UniProtKB/Swiss-Prot annotation:
Source superkingdom: Viruses
Gene: VP1
Protein name stated in the entry: RNA-directed RNA polymerase
Functional description taken from the UniProt entry: RNA-dependent RNA polymerase which is found both free and covalently attached to the genomic RNA. May also contain guanylyl and methyl transferase activities.
Originating organism: Infectious pancreatic necrosis virus (strain Sp)
Keywords of the record: Covalent protein-RNA linkage, GTP-binding, Nucleotide-binding, Nucleotidyltransferase, Phosphoprotein, RNA-directed RNA polymerase, Transferase, Viral RNA replication, Virion
């Protein structure tokens, strides 16, 4: 193909498209040099610790984990003994209950590496050449710009997992957000109690209760598995987990699929001990001791996220995933998953600003555009929220706003407020009775927030303080959504100032939450009209042909969760396309095949490429004639290669449908067949009719808007539509375990004639005083929990208790290594109790 490109006419066309010049081979200009990261100066614990100390970042005195002891699974999980007998669970589990201990270490892979660039993260040069070839074969007006953008993306981006320097600099940046120009503030410091936050969340994240069949929050995790040996009746109510994801501490280097039994043993033991703390003479001290014994359940592995990073920032910006210990993830998910799975309520189907559960397909993006046009016609402000993303339409201008390093703005009290909302609105029956017991209320309100917010992380052999919440924990989305809700509520209170104004930016200091304006689209009405008027007359979703439009449809670039909207003449509605910047980056750099089990199959790499090219076409490549033509050619070519190998293409690809990086966005959409216009019709045709005025109100506080609730909270006039029983129940979750026991009488219902808190009797007023006292105890208990989960800063790097650190570039297994065992340690009370219980189980 090089000879074709270097013919005088073609060479001139290519150089003209790239806006470059050369006297030599055109491919020297067309194909950027492979990026090789610089040598990482912080790839050893000594260098990393010195760097962190220089920047006054908190390094914790290391804690050791008891060595693993092998025990019988049926003794540790007696209710699941039948699963062991039937081979559903392994016979032995390894739990940290030894009499010696080790210091954990975690060395993640960083690829590409300076010493070995390898093939991981390599750009798709073959597709780049195909784009160039079809540029020469066709006269697409936007072809030269597309080729230039893809080539520039290859030259300036790099897919990979960053570097130690990038990870450590990210930690510093997170700390800077939390403690810098706008130090973090708790909801109460901003002016919101947990109950007031719950009222706001009723508007911004409406929810449905769990299914009636879902077990209450009263059980240890292993009790959520109902096993009889009959597949027709067997049932597991455990939250869904990704089996191939990391198990976290204390099982470094293993996956969740490898350690399911171990996670159940530890989670059961932890929640059981927490329950016993409730009935002890000193519940606070007992709970603190439990947290100390299980300290590793609050320490996440600092995992570098694979992304398309900017080459120039390779050593400055690596996104960190706080890889939670499996038992911690399991317990938190038991609180959140049963509810969120039933609560896909968003602005397209409910009167709420929430975008949770939103899909741009099947008319989703058109519903958004309909709502936007309705507000433009009525000259009304519009706001939407999804996690740390806020979208505002005001004065014919569209604003896309992101919380700056959203997780860094979180405090334990933010998560406590979210837990309060979960318990009082979700895990509660219609009659006001709770679907949880004191143990789970304590875990949710007292322990859980301290385990994942302002907790600790492990990188190399360094145990470090984390600022804000760990990214990727089971409550990351929920906590971010709550913080965005606070920003929007304060925006309403301030009179809805223009997002580009000083008054709007002053909300940062008021809320303690940093944010930035990512996009401003002025004169949105004209942009929408132009998109409709200039929509393509030919090609996909226009005349019904199986060809791309010669000129792409003009996109309304909302940046709505990464999606834009283009108008389809055939459907007479807007359809989604991926934001152009994201699309170009996806074309330039494949993420590669990461599923190890599928990677071993013959034809695996070819299958991945087929799915990749079909996904590129479906998410918006179909609207770009050059990308669509090249991706279609590549997909068909790879299919032929599979057929030559004698593999049934359609059946083989069924397992690969979720292998695309857009699997979450394309849920329920097949990538196994070549894309046609009918494919686009099938995935974009609305499943139901939509009338913006027919959207039902939120399940709670019907008839209220976020603005009205905010105003009512500010003025103090808001009345809860539920009875005083609800009021008392709401307060119940504020209690520490000891207060639940000592002041249980404060939770009896109000008189049946009383409908509102304000109408309650003197008895209720007295009870409220007790509850306020309990709330003060809870505030201090959050601090106690954090103290139980960390130690004071160490003035020196770990030395003498671990072997010399391995070079992660040359070690046989650089991902995981254990340090030398420390001195003997006494058995903890938990270990002693577990041993007695298991011995009793054996005798029985």
């Amino acid at each position: 193909m090089s000879d074709i490109f270097n013919s005088p006419q073609n060479k001139a066309s290519i150089l003209n498209a790239l806006m470059k010049s050369t006297q030599g081979d055109v491919e020297d200009v067309l194909i950027p040099k492979r990026f090789r990261p610089a040598k990482d100066p912080l790839d050893s614990p000594q260098a990393a610790a010195a760097f962190l100390k220089e920047h006054k970042y908190r390094i914790l005195r290391p804690r050791a984990i008891p060595t693993m002891v092998e025990i019988e699974t049926d003794a540790a999980l007696p209710r699941l003994a039948a699963m062991v007998d039937d081979g559903k669970l392994k016979e032995m589990v390894n739990v940290p209950e030894g009499t010696t201990a080790f210091y954990p270490k975690y060395y993640p892979f960083h690829r590409p590496d300076h010493d070995d660039v390898g093939t991981f993260g390599a750009p798709d040069i073959t597709l780049l050449k195909q784009l160039t070839f079809f540029l020469l074969e066709n006269d697409f007006p936007t072809g030269p710009e597309t080729l230039r953008q893809v080539r520039e993306a290859i030259a300036t981006l790099q897919y990979g997992s960053g570097s130690y320097s990038g990870q450590l600099n990210r930690l510093l940046a997170m700390k800077g957000v939390a403690t810098g120009r706008n130090p973090n503030k708790t909801p109460l410091a901003v002016g919101y109690t947990n109950e007031q936050m719950a009222r706001l969340m009723e508007q911004t994240l409406p929810i449905n209760p769990p299914k009636n069949e879902d077990p209450d929050l009263r059980w240890a995790p292993s009790w959520l598995i109902q096993y009889t040996g009959d597949a027709s009746t067997d049932k597991s109510y455990l939250p869904h987990v990704t089996a191939k994801s990391s198990a976290g501490l204390p099982y470094i280097g293993k996956t969740k699929g490898d350690t399911t039994a171990e996670a159940l043993v530890l989670a059961d033991s932890f929640i059981r001990d927490l329950g016993k703390a409730a009935t002890s003479a000193d519940p606070g001290a007992a709970a603190k001791k439990v947290l100390s014994d299980f300290w590793y359940l609050s320490c996440g592995l600092l995992f570098p996220k694979g992304e398309r990073y900017t080459q120039k920032d390779w050593d400055l910006k690596t996104r960190n995933i706080w890889s939670a210990p499996y038992p911690t993830h399991l317990l938190l998910s038991m609180v959140s998953s049963p509810v969120m799975d039933e609560s896909k309520l968003n602005i397209t189907n409910t009167q709420t600003p929430s975008l949770y559960g939103f899909s741009p397909f099947h008319g989703g993006i058109n519903r958004i555009m309909t709502i936007i046009r309705e507000h433009l016609d009525q000259e009304q402000d519009l706001v939407m929220i999804y996690a740390d993303n806020i979208y505002i339409l005001q004065d014919n201008t569209w604003y896309s706003i992101d919380l700056e390093k959203g997780e860094a703005n979180c405090t334990p009290q933010h998560m406590q407020a979210m837990m309060y909302y979960r318990l009082t609105r979700e895990w509660t029956n219609e009659d006001g009775s709770p679907r949880y017991n004191p143990t789970w209320a304590t875990f949710a309100m007292y322990v859980g927030p301290s385990m994942v917010v302002d907790s600790t992380c492990l990188l190399m052999n360094l145990q470090l303080k984390t600022t804000g919440q760990g990214s990727g924990n089971a409550f990351t989305f929920l906590n971010n959504h709550l913080m965005s809700t606070i920003v929007v509520a304060e925006w309403h209170k301030a009179g809805r100032p223009n997002p580009m104004s000083k008054e709007f930016m002053d909300l940062e200091a008021k809320t303690g939450i940093n944010f930035k304006i990512e996009r401003e689209l002025k004169d949105l009405r004209s942009i929408i009209m132009e998109a409709v008027d200039t929509a393509p007359l030919d090609g996909y979703l226009a005349d019904g042909s199986d060809l791309p439009p010669r000129v792409p449809g003009k996109a309304v670039e909302l940046d709505l969760l990464g999606w834009s909207a283009v108008y389809s003449r055939q459907l007479e509605m807007f359809v989604p396309v991926l934001e152009n910047e994201r699309l170009i980056a996806s074309v330039a750099y494949p993420k590669g095949l990461e599923n190890k089990s599928l990677a071993r199959k013959p034809g695996a790499e070819i299958a991945y490429q087929i799915v990749r090219y079909e996904a590129i076409r479906l998410i918006g490549g179909w609207n770009n004639p050059l990308i669509e033509t090249a991706a279609k050619h590549m997909s068909l070519d790879k299919r032929k290669r599979l057929e030559v190998k004698g593999i049934d293409v359609t059946g083989f690809l069924d397992d690969w449908n979720t292998m695309s990086e857009f699997g979450g966005d394309l849920e329920g959409i097949s990538l196994t067949a070549p894309l046609t216009n009918q494919t686009l019709l099938d995935i974009n045709t609305p499943e139901t009719e939509f009338d913006v005025k027919d959207r039902p109100p939120t399940p709670r506080s019907p008839g209220k808007t976020l603005a009205e609730v905010t105003a009512a909270i500010t003025s103090g006039t808001y009345k809860d539509p539920k009875s005083a029983v609800w009021r008392l129940l709401d307060q119940r979750t504020k209690l520490r375990v000891s207060t639940l026991r000592d002041h249980a009488h404060a939770l009896k219902p109000a008189a049946s004639t009383s409908d509102f808190w304000g109408d309650a009797t003197e008895e209720l007023a007295e009870q409220q005083q007790l509850l306020m006292k309990a709330n003060n105890l809870l505030k201090s208990s959050l601090t106690e929990a954090r103290e139980a989960l960390e130690t004071v800063q160490s003035d020196k790097i770990i030395s003498g208790k671990t072997s010399p650190e391995k070079n992660p570039g040359t070690a046989a297994n650089p991902v995981v290594a254990y340090g030398e065992f420390s001195e003997k340690i006494p058995l903890t009370p938990t270990q002693k109790k577990n041993a007695k219980r298991r011995e009793k189980q054996r005798r029985n």
